[in-house]
């Protein structure tokens, strides 16, 4: 099941592009945020975040989910 919390966490991750800063923004621990994003990936059935040492990038699917979850903060490119 997809939760609003998971969508908020993905939106924060899209803004900050860093698990630690996104977690701080959401007032949760980094492991808690990471676990919820993984659960969201399982619920959707697709990878949403490319995890690299010291860096992350949202996949195309991740960007689309973030846009749908919070269209004011993540507008579609024109």
Where are the predicted features?
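Short, structured secondary-structure boundary patches
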Residues: 2-3, 37, 44, 53-55, ...
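N-terminal short secondary-structure element
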Residues: 1-36, 50, 65
């Amino acid at each position: 099941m997809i939760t609003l919390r998971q969508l908020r966490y993905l939106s924060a991750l899209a803004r900050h592009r860093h698990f630690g800063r996104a977690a701080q923004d959401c007032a949760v621990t980094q492991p808690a945020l990471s676990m919820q994003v993984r659960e969201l990936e399982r619920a959707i059935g697709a990878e949403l975040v490319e995890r690299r040492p010291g860096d992350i990038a949202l996949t195309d699917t991740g960007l689309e989910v973030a846009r749908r979850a919070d269209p004011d903060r993540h507008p579609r490119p024109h």
